[in-house]
Structures are given as C-alpha cells and as structure tokens.
Amino acid sequence: MPKIGPMEILIIVLLVVVVFGVGKLPQVGDAIGKGIRNFRKASTGEDAKEEVETKEETKPAEKSE
C-alpha cells in the first residue's frame, strides 16, 4: 500500500481548496469532523448506550397524590 507523505497531503489540501473554495472550508471541515465522530461512536457502540440512557430518562414520572 502506498504511503501518504507530506507532499501528497499538500496536494489533497490544495485540491479541496480549489473545489470548495476558501469560504466553504470551515463547513466542510465541520461536516467531516462530525462524520468521523459519528463513525467512532458507532464502531465502539456508544450509540446503543446513549439510547438506553435516553429511554430511561424519558420515562414518565409517577403521579403523586
């Protein structure tokens, strides 16, 4: 498998700047970061834990008399 060096990374960054423009870079970076974060959560199973916790928190409270 070919290794990615600093020159290849620079070329990729330049291509991203040309394609998306400087104004869109923060939005693109944010979207990529969220995607990576969601992928990591899904691969470690944190989503399932959060769903269980959310369901427990949303149970209706018992009425007091």
From Swiss-Prot:
UniProt GO BP: protein transport by the Tat complex
Signal peptide start-end: none
TM region(s), chain numbering: 9-29
GO cellular component: TAT protein transport complex
Entry membrane topology: Single-pass membrane protein
Segments of this protein annotated with the region Disordered: 40-65
Chief location bin: membrane
Family annotation (InterPro entries): TatA/B/E, TatA/E
Compositionally biased region (Basic and acidic residues): 43-65
Keyword entries, A-Z: Cell membrane, Membrane, Protein transport, Translocation, Transmembrane, Transmembrane helix, Transport
Superkingdom of the source species: Bacteria
Locations listed in the record: Cell membrane
Keyword Cytoplasm attached: no
Recorded GO MF terms: protein transmembrane transporter activity
Quaternary structure (record): Forms a complex with TatC.
Role according to the record: Part of the twin-arginine translocation (Tat) system that transports large folded proteins containing a characteristic twin-arginine motif in their signal peptide across membranes. TatA could form the protein-conducting channel of the Tat system.
Cross-referenced HAMAP family: TatA_E
Family: Belongs to the TatA/E family.
Descriptive protein name: Sec-independent protein translocase protein TatA
